[in-house]
């Protein structure tokens, strides 16, 4: 008879399980896309969740063409200010390095407070050879009453598409000092990858952190503990052993999240729930509805990018029948 075996509890794919350095998530890779030149990412602030009634667009579903209720996450997406752009080229080892940097004029003073070195950047012509183009954008925190921080977050977004990198450079030059909106990035019916920092849970025990089984009822001293720290040799505790420690506040990427709806700031009454969203308030700017849940607490910065591993095709539109505006306060 074979020896019964259970696969290890807790994935090693998420090591080290430590707190993220910043609440600002980092997009470390960008997919190659075809078509017209466009920005490959965007950012917003998580508001909360509600539910909608829509026509099931999945052709092979048993409810295809019928109204279904689905949960959605509301993300407030005010326009982003394009404050600069960068050109990258490959070094001898194949790594991308910055070869040129340009900044817009008449920037907000908050930008200089976060990056004072901007004033020292000399104006010069871009080089002839470069491999990648990325714009530098800043969030408009002052326009979002629901979040406490009023300092803008500054980060890069890749420019993709087109027939050459020169077209991407022209796109960056034309948008320098202007604003981009969510429609410049995506639209309802398409997929996006969501990158954010998860909710922090603090220091938690073995069972909650790894899902290991409780020890028998008659075990001495504790039950919510692992049975062993490992063998006698090797004579150290290996990192594969489940132990108590930090849980949450870690960067995670959710792939292939469908965009259900986009609305501008004139249409916020169609999404603001009665009494406001818990721990956030009312949406005042452009917003998007994303299918299902996404990582992070309300008010947290959420970044989106083009899907890296899209498996099903986009659809032209999502037919919404009803958006729940009932209070989320339990009354």
Swiss-Prot record:
It comes from the Archaea. InterPro entries: L3_arc_euk, Ribosomal_L3_dom_3_arc_sf, Ribosomal_uL3, Ribosomal_uL3_arc, Transl_B-barrel_sf. The keyword Membrane does not apply. The keyword Phosphoprotein does not apply. Keywords: Ribonucleoprotein, Ribosomal protein, RNA-binding, rRNA-binding. One of its GO terms (biological process) is translation. Belongs to the universal ribosomal protein uL3 family. Part of the 50S ribosomal subunit. Forms a cluster with proteins L14 and L24e. One of the primary rRNA binding proteins, it binds directly near the 3'-end of the 23S rRNA, where it nucleates assembly of the 50S subunit. This is Large ribosomal subunit protein uL3. It comes from Thermoplasma acidophilum (strain ATCC 25905 / DSM 1728 / JCM 9062 / NBRC 15155 / AMRC-C165). The gene is rpl3.
């Amino acid at each position: 008879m074979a020896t019964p075996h259970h696969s290890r509890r807790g994935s090693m794919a998420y090591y080290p399980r430590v707190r993220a350095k910043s609440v600002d998530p980092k997009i470390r890779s960008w997919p190659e896309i075809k078509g017209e030149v466009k920005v490959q990412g965007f950012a917003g602030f998580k508001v909360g969740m509600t539910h909608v009634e829509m026509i099931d667009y999945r052709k092979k579903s048993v409810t295809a063409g019928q109204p279904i209720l689905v949960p959605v996450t509301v993300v407030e997406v005010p326009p982003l200010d394009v404050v600069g752009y960068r050109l990258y080229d490959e070094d001898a080892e194949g790594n991308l390095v910055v070869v040129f940097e340009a900044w817009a004029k008449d920037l907000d003073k908050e930008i200089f407070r976060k990056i004072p070195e901007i004033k020292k950047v000399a104006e010069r012509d871009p080089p002839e050879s470069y491999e990648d183009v990325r714009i530098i954008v800043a969030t408009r925190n002052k326009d979002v009453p629901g979040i406490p921080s009023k300092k803008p977050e500054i980060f890069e977004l890749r420019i993709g598409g087109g027939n050459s990198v020169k077209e991407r450079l022209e796109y960056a030059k034309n948008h320098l000092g202007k604003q981009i909106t969510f429609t410049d990035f995506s639209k309802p019916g398409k997929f996006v990858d969501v990158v954010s920092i998860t909710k922090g849970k603090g220091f938690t025990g073995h069972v909650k952190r790894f899902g290991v089984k409780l020890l028998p009822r008659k075990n001495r001293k504790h039950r919510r503990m692992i049975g062993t720290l490992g063998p006698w040799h090797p004579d150290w505790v290996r990192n594969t052993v489940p132990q108590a420690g930090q849980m949450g506040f870690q960067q995670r990427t959710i792939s292939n999240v469908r965009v259900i709806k986009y609305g501008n700031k004139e249409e916020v009454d169609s999404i603001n729930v009665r009494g406001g969203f818990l721990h956030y308030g009312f949406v005042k700017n452009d917003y998007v509805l994303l299918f299902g849940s996404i990582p992070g607490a309300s008010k947290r910065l959420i970044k989106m990018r083009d899907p890296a591993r899209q498996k099903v095709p986009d659809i032209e539109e999502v037919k919404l029948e009803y958006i729940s505006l009932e209070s989320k306060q339990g009354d």
